[in-house]
Amino acid sequence: MANIKSAIKRVKTAEKRRVANVQRKSSMRSAIKAVETFATEGNKEQALVAFNTASKKIDKAAAKGLIHSNKAGRDKSRLARLVNAL
């Protein structure tokens, strides 16, 4: 454990950020899975709504640095193809 006051604060801050990042990433993954589920069921309306939500979460994750911008584009493109195929 750190002894210096600023280092102790950095440990606490890093833990808070880690927890927030895990939540954001998990939320993004859940949104992606929702689109895939609705698409496999053939439910275009719900898949489209879920795609819009997932797209927003993917963009936010890329902006926060949780995922690379190329991965964000790739994921959105893949989901868009999935929804448009319905």
Curated annotation (Swiss-Prot):
Cross-referenced HAMAP family: Ribosomal_bS20
Assigned keywords, A-Z: Ribonucleoprotein, Ribosomal protein, RNA-binding, rRNA-binding
One Pfam family hit: Ribosomal_S20p
Taxon lineage: Bacteria, Bacillati, Bacillota, Bacilli, Bacillales
Highest taxon listed in the record's lineage: Bacteria
Function: Binds directly to 16S ribosomal RNA.
A GO BP entry: translation
GO cellular component, one term: small ribosomal subunit
GO MF entry, a single one: structural constituent of ribosome
The protein's name in its UniProt record: Small ribosomal subunit protein bS20
Family listed: Belongs to the bacterial ribosomal protein bS20 family.
